[in-house]
Amino acid sequence: MGTDAWDGKQAAPPRRARRWLRWLMAAPLLFAAASVLQVLILRVVDPPISSMMAGRYLEAWGEGDWSFSLHRQWRDYDKIAASLPISVVAAEDQQFPMHHGFDLQAIEKARDHNARGGRVRGASTISQQVAKNVFLWQGRSWVRKGLEAWYTVLIELFWPKQRILEMYLNVAEFGDGVYGAQAAAQQFWSKDAAGLSPSESARLAAVLPSPRRYDARRPGAFVQRRAGWIQRQARQLGGPAYLQAP
């Protein structure tokens, strides 16, 4: 009897180990299923807040600013001036209509540029930025980069290009705490996003790399130069019709 009791005690740890092993094996599958469901839902449902917006709240509260609030208001793609999407694409990701989430040529150029030293250049596509802004957190860890790649693949697989761009135009930060085209148009020019001029659209696109540093409403020399370049690039691409290309 003593031997049987001892055998039972010895058998318990292996059973627990197998149970934990099963959970560890199931966890990636559960995450994959949950993330696919997330992406499918957001194909048709407009998110009330993105992970980056939530991060701004946490950042402000961590600094003791409990009165902090964001400016945001969703606008459907067809309710945004046609000059803004093409300005953003001209500024951020000119291969957007053609690539499947990753611009390998831009990545190679950025790597070569960064290897030579100087100012670090990124190569994130609009799809990658949507994956980061909607689903993930700030940071440069390999885990976050891996998740960004995973979500990029999913949104390219399950969302049409127009939905990806619509999401970007509604969650991108265009000023300190100002998220989305509608909030930017109202805060900066007291108008609706549908009424943005090509010049205003180019200025909004120009501040995207550092929206808390640059001001689209009162642009400095850098933003003015970049906005002019963006307008020229948008014209060379063919204007808004470029985004209708198959």
Swiss-Prot record:
It is a single-pass membrane protein. GO terms for cellular component: peptidoglycan-based cell wall; plasma membrane. It comes from the Bacteria. It catalyses: [GlcNAc-(1->4)-Mur2Ac(oyl-L-Ala-gamma-D-Glu-L-Lys-D-Ala-D-Ala)](n)-di-trans,octa-cis-undecaprenyl diphosphate + beta-D-GlcNAc-(1->4)-Mur2Ac(oyl-L-Ala-gamma-D-Glu-L-Lys-D-Ala-D-Ala)-di-trans,octa-cis-undecaprenyl diphosphate = [GlcNAc-(1->4)-Mur2Ac(oyl-L-Ala-gamma-D-Glu-L-Lys-D-Ala-D-Ala)](n+1)-di-trans,octa-cis-undecaprenyl diphosphate + di-trans,octa-cis-undecaprenyl diphosphate + H(+). Gene3D superfamilies: Biosynthetic peptidoglycan transglycosylase-like. It is found in: Cell inner membrane. The chain crosses the membrane at residues 20-42. GO terms for molecular function: pentosyltransferase activity; peptidoglycan glycosyltransferase activity. Keywords: Cell inner membrane, Cell membrane, Cell shape, Cell wall biogenesis/degradation, Glycosyltransferase, Membrane, Peptidoglycan synthesis, Transferase, Transmembrane, Transmembrane helix. One of its GO terms (biological process) is peptidoglycan biosynthetic process. Its EC number is 2.4.99.28. Pathway: Cell wall biogenesis; peptidoglycan biosynthesis. NCBIfam families: mono_pep_trsgly. Belongs to the glycosyltransferase 51 family. Peptidoglycan polymerase that catalyzes glycan chain elongation from lipid-linked precursors. This is Biosynthetic peptidoglycan transglycosylase. It comes from Xanthomonas axonopodis pv. citri (strain 306). The gene is mtgA.
